[in-house]
UniProtKB/Swiss-Prot annotation:
The protein's Enzyme Commission number: 3.6.4.-
Residue numbers spanned by region Head domain (RuvB-H): 260-347
Reaction equation(s) it catalyzes: ATP + H2O = ADP + phosphate + H(+)
Location of the region described as Large ATPase domain (RuvB-L) in the Swiss-Prot/TrEMBL record: 1-186
Gene Ontology, cellular component aspect: cytoplasm; Holliday junction resolvase complex
Oligomeric form and interacting partners: Homohexamer. Forms an RuvA(8)-RuvB(12)-Holliday junction (HJ) complex. HJ DNA is sandwiched between 2 RuvA tetramers; dsDNA enters through RuvA and exits via RuvB. An RuvB hexamer assembles on each DNA strand where it exits the tetramer. Each RuvB hexamer is contacted by two RuvA subunits (via domain III) on 2 adjacent RuvB subunits; this complex drives branch migration. In the full resolvosome a probable DNA-RuvA(4)-RuvB(12)-RuvC(2) complex forms which resolves the HJ.
Location relative to the cell: Cytoplasm
Residue sites binding Mg(2+) per the record: T71
Name under which the protein is recorded: Holliday junction branch migration complex subunit RuvB
Gene assigned in the entry: ruvB
InterPro entries (alphabetical): AAA+_ATPase, AAA_lid_4, DNA_helicase_Holl-junc_RuvB, P-loop_NTPase, RuvB-like_N, RuvB_C, WH-like_DNA-bd_sf, WH_DNA-bd_sf
Length: 347
């Protein structure tokens, strides 16, 4: 049996799932995992109950925008269950033998984390559904008239599936998950807690005002907050400062072309395109994405959640529309018979 709490990756392509440079900042236990209070409280109860019964935790489905900690939480779940975890993503399963090798190599009560689970191939999904429900695996040996099906027992394991597109997960697969949780964008207060905790890990002090300014520019996403914190730390180091001040954060954000609302250059390009090319909308997501050189998936997964949360874009049945707040932010005049551009904000 493998060591408890071990973390293994099933492909070198999983770097985006668990960046080693970010590993030192990842919380290892629930106590250090900031935000997502309801998710943590619910999971804590289910984990405790499973441990008291000496059973594997039921399968867990995690959804929400990227960068909110789904992979990190999966590792924490494994830690709390005293179990090993294997981390992979749906595109890594190309053929049935890929999933067979992984499932047969699992330990009792171990955790298998699959990111982008909505991208599973149908034949892989069918095999996984059987494994999740019956803890058995049907394996076809031979071909043609000589083919026969061998049923292999599997250990009682926990599958944690994560996705940014829960609507694309099929009903049969979704029904196999006994626990579901949705991640929401973090509040500024929660991000401040994360930034202050991680600044200590990075051996740099940060002032309260500076932490709030950094949090306000992090799009409600811990991954972005951590990335910005590292870059601001670089600036503080080069300028000879032992403390990150609000002035240093402002310098860093200006260098990175991030404005006071946390919008970067591409965010502003999206708003400008929506207003200037499509008269404020409504316009379909595919058309809007093409106009700014993005895919519809990246627009919906990365940019839209924050722009909608901040009130810059509204989503209607006819498409995306720019709000009055978007016009004000870009210093554009909103008129019923068209638009006059008064002055663009320069960054």
């Amino acid at each position: 049996m493998k060591d408890e709490n071990s973390i293994s990756f099933l492909s070198s392509n999983e770097n985006y799932l668990y960046d080693k440079s970010e590993n030192e900042l990842r919380p290892k236990v629930f106590e250090d995992f900031k935000g997502q209070v309801n998710v943590k409280e619910t999971l804590s109860i289910f984990i405790r109950a499973s441990k008291e019964r000496d059973e594997a935790l039921d399968h867990v489905f995690l959804s929400g925008p990227p960068g909110l900690g789904k992979t990190t939480l999966a590792s924490i779940i494994a830690f709390e269950m005293n179990a090993s975890i294997k981390i992979t993503s749906a595109p890594a399963f190309d053929k049935p033998k890929d999933i067979i090798g992984i499932l047969t190599g699992l330990d009792e009560k171990s955790v298998l984390f699959i990111d982008e689970i909505h991208r599973l191939r149908p034949i892989i999904e069918e095999m996984l559904c059987i494994a999740m429900e019956d803890y058995e695996l049907d394996w076809v040996i031979g071909q043609g008239a000589n083919a026969r099906t061998v049923r292999m027992p599997l250990p009682k394991f926990t599958l944690i599936g994560a996705t940014t597109k829960p609507g694309k997960v099929t009903s049969p697969l979704y029904a196999r998950f006994g626990i579901t949780a949705r991640f929401e964008l973090y509040s500024e207060i929660e991000l401040v807690e994360i930034i202050k905790r991680n600044s200590l890990i990075l051996n740099i002090e940060i002032e309260e005002d500076a932490a709030f300014l950094l949090a306000r520019s992090s799009r409600g996403t811990p991954r972005i907050a951590n990335r910005l914190l590292r870059r601001i730390r670089d600036i503080a180091q080069v300028t000879g400062s032992l403390v990150i001040t609000s002035d240093i954060v402002s310098i860093g954000l200006e260098m990175l072309r991030i404005d006071g609302e946390g919008l970067d250059e591409q965010d502003r390009n999206i708003l400008r395109s929506l207003i200037l090319k499509f008269n404020g909308g409504p316009v379909g997501v595919d058309t809007l994405a093409i106009s700014v050189g993005e895919t519809a998936d990246s627009l919906e997964d990365f940019y839209e959640p924050y722009l909608i949360m901040k009130g810059f874009i509204s989503r209607t049945h006819r498409g995306r529309k720019a709000t009055e707040f978007a016009y004000l932010h870009l210093n554009l005049e909103m008129k019923e018979d068209g638009l006059n551009e008064n002055q663009r904000v320069s960054f």
